[in-house]
Amino acid sequence: MDRGMPAATIDEIPLEWCFSNGVLLDFRHKADGERITAQDVKRELGRIKYEIKPLDIVLVQTGADAFWGKPEYLIKGAGMTKESTLFLTEKGVKVVGIDAWSWDRPLPFLAEEFKQNGDPKVIWEAHFAGIEIGYCHMEKMANLSAIGRSSGFTVCCFPVKIKGASAGWVRPVAIVD
């Protein structure tokens, strides 16, 4: 769903969403399983002196990619919340990415919180932000440090066109001049 309309399938995603200015937000200081709140995003944007523009592609660096291929990868990194995701999408962001296993916090942290309070809204809350405002997210990104700057680069991330699919592969590239 997207504002009450059926969600776009991967073959319906407008290509202009997938080639745009990039911005890299650094949250490597946050603990594994910690929430990246809208206030955190605002603070980071202030630190790097950047104002989000429509169709910016926002990349979130948690440091989780350093654990790729290791069992602990699945529990590494902070994760976005519904609130922080909506903060970005309300500004016109349509594509985001993260270097962790999921756009949300790692699953064991979600499961533990659900076990403690029984509130199903903690499960995939950032994913479900797309029900209110549609967006696409890339997960398991790597080498975000190689970009070398927080803005002033272009991201190209065209998805493989699979008819009717809710997701697809992408090979994202940051073009740094």
Regions found by a protein language model. Name each.
Residues 1-177:
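Active-/binding-site microenvironments in catalytic and ligand-binding cores
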